[in-house]
Amino acid sequence: MKIIYQEQPNECGICVLGMLANELHEDKYAHDELLEQINLPASGLSFFELETYGKKFGLEIASYQLTLEELKQLEGKYFIVHFPKHFVVVHKKQDNLWEVFDPAKGKYLLNDEELKKQWTGYAATVQKSFKEIPPINKRNFFKHFFDLNLIIFYVFIELIIIGISTLLATASKTMIANTVDFGTSVNIVVFVVFFLVLKGLYLLLYALLQMVRNVLFWKQYRGYLGWIMQTLQTKSFVYFSNKSPNQLTERQFYLKEVLSFFNVHIPNLIISCTVALIIGTLIGINQMEFLWIAIVQIVVNCAIFLYDFFFTKRITKQAIPQMELQNKVSLQLDGNLRDEQNGKRFNYLMMQLRKALIKNQNISNQKEVNHLASDGVKSFAQQVFDFLILALGIIGIIEQRYTLAFLFYIFSIQALFSAYATRIIQFGAAVNLYQFCKDKLVTLFEDKVNDCNFKVSWKCPKVINLNNCSITLNQNLDLANLNLNLTNGMVISGENGSGKSTLLKILTGRGLSYQGQIKLDELDLKDFSASQLFHNVYYLTGQLTAYNDITDFGYSEALLNCKNPQVYQLLADTGIHNQIKLSSGQKQILQLFLLQNLKDKVILLDETLNAIATELKPRVYQLLIKPLTYNNFVLMVEHDLRFVNSEQDLINLSPYLQQT
């Protein structure tokens, strides 16, 4: 670990954080940079502040008061130890020997007794974690993702590869020139052996360098991906309500393309401009006709590349809506199979899915055929130019304008020139893709919090009033003129399709439209923000096909908070605690059990007892549903009316149905 020396007595804490960040994250913080990161108090940092600021540097710090023996038993490589008015980092080197990294004195060793004399008894463990994410926008995007040191390293790797290629060309020229008088057979054998050895070394070194480059790239990619995904933990409800899961998973593609632009395309541009200038000059000095061939080859390669790029861009624009349609229909089909039994709708959705699949397959086939055709044309053009160079070279040898050695040399560097010059044109396409991915990443970072500007504060209602409410169920059926006073514990019934579930869903405030007024006590439902309703209104359906295992529900945590032994007995009698896979009835019991610690919420239960055995329903109601009414507002949709205590606790929606 490299020491960062403090310049003032109060800087030991920040220096310790910088040393650990440099060691665990391979950062390169210097003293002055650390002071820019934190507004350092005059008294220095405390353990609490070390824990807080440590997250900024990607450090998970936990402090303890403990003995030396307990310190020895802690897991970890490095520990922060508190001396009187001073912090140091220690590392257990041997059983009775500690290596100390002191921002005031440097590195030194202490045995147990020496450490014990200076130590105050307070220490902290240090673990590597993801760094906190600062706000990212278009103005500071470049700063967050551009790493000059990595770009310099990648340019250095490219220079090594080019140097090897140039050395190979020069060596070939030298070998042919020095063996041309030994006879044709000897000349060929020497050249082939020497060429294969050099080519083998080149390929081996090229593979190693590319491996190093790929390892560094994917290490950086994984770090940034974890760094970005950590932001999801701090995002608001509004953020997730406005972002689809597909948008969140797209981050990986956008991130990879952005990092490729900085770490691949920018170094390639720097190298390509340099190589094109130097080698183009060399070719022009030696023979202009080869330079013109190279220029024509570059133009042809660029034309093929641009055709492929714009074709792919156009076909991708066609593919996006088809893919979105395919995903949308797949979700609808999944809902049909899980929540409905509607053969006509199933057949319609399958027809739509088949159409989308066929169109997507046709688009994929077009892209594949186009890529194959482009590669074929490019390969053919390369062969044509190779034969043209060879023909000009043979003519030049016959006319004694240059030697065989020069032909091999010019052949090698001309190929290098055309390859790198073509990359300059390809950089334009990379810029186009970078701009697109950058904008997408910035958009995904944005978190609009205007939803939090709600008009009223949440309070659990005692009554929900519906005044002249009308709800459209489908094109032929409405719930009209609903004037209802819904009270805690009330059960809603009615024939199938009478709008029971729709009414509960409207009370969630999640976008279903209605006419009229719905009031929670004296407050209008529309006055609450979507975030407030999401956190305070619970809607549970009996259709729980997505969950199979008790670990999906956080079962262990809920058990710790359960105080009623009869509930324990219910869980044991229904076999929930020892089941690997849960039945539908067990899932319903479990989801009701997990609600037990809720307070001041509106809980909407949509047929959450329909899969439970008939003999168990009264017991489940008494132990899991009725207690919810003590601290919450509960509404139930049920066909089984044995739980209704009086007519005042029952609402039948069937009389409100109207044909339209």
Swiss-Prot record:
Location, primary (coarse class): membrane
Peptidase C39 domain boundaries: 6-126
Disulfide bonds: none
Listed GO MF terms: ATP binding; ATP hydrolysis activity; ATPase-coupled transmembrane transporter activity; cysteine-type peptidase activity
Keywords from the named record: ATP-binding, Cell membrane, Hydrolase, Membrane, Nucleotide-binding, Protease, Thiol protease, Transmembrane, Transmembrane helix, Transport
Segments traversing the membrane: 150-170, 188-208, 265-285, 290-310, 379-399, 402-422
PROSITE patterns: ABC_TRANSPORTER_2, PEPTIDASE_C39
Compartments, record wording: Cell membrane
Active site (catalytic residues): C12
Domain ABC transporter residues, every copy: 464-660
Membrane topology: Multi-pass membrane protein
InterPro entries found in the cross-reference section: ABC1_TM_sf, ABC_transporter-like_ATP-bd, ECF_ABC_transporter_ATP-bd, P-loop_NTPase, Peptidase_C39
Pfam families, per the entry: ABC_tran (PF00005), Peptidase_C39 (PF03412)
Recorded GO CC terms: ATP-binding cassette (ABC) transporter complex
Binding annotation for ATP: G494, E495, N496, G497, S498, G499, K500, S501
Homology family: Belongs to the ABC transporter superfamily.
This protein's name: Putative ABC transporter ATP-binding MG390 homolog
